Amino acid sequence: NYLPKPSLTFHPLQFLSIILLIPGMQFFSGYLTSAVSLLFPNWLSQYEKLMETAGLDSDIELFMFIYAVILGPVCEELVFRGVTMRLVRRALPFWAANLMQAVLFGIFHMNWIQGIYAFVLGLVLGWICEKGGSIYFSMFFHILFNFWGTIIGPLLNNLKETDLLGIIIFLFTIVSLVLGFSLFRLGTKWRDQKAARLMAAPDHDDHFEAAE
């Protein structure tokens, strides 16, 4: 859905749920990265060197920020959720198409650390795109996810680590993920119900023109 009618495609709760999901997915990715790093320490050092070489460390420049937060997510969504998943979806069920694009998305990042959490992220992005019915949802999620990782994440790393903080973050991660996914499904349901009412209305064409 590249040219959506807002009344048919979007519901505010869907966007709010995505905002709620971002910190949970970021913290979950951090847990996953830590677990993989414990098993394969050399992967983490290779990843850190790659980020520094690419200019994506704490001293990120403006151009790299724009690329990492806006251009990269938009282009990646068009390629993996827009083209790849859409084409595979014609021949395979959603779960298979989503799995395939997520694997390719992980491989695309060309290092083990990023590849593993990019695979998980790809599954989530594919689900959001499919269930939401629009690639704009996965673009919105991807942009916010990268913004958090680029700006907010490094700021949080400056916090003093304590057992209490660790427990709070862990519990917040669970709440963020459960509520985020649940509210996205609810927002999609409400969006569909509203769209059905609008389609049933005699003057729905005029309403859509006004909404656009």
Language-model features, listed with the residues they occupy:
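C-terminal membrane module of polytopic membrane proteins
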Residues: 143-212
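Juxtamembrane helix-loop-helix connectors linking adjacent transmembrane helices
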Residues: 2-72, 90, 198, 212
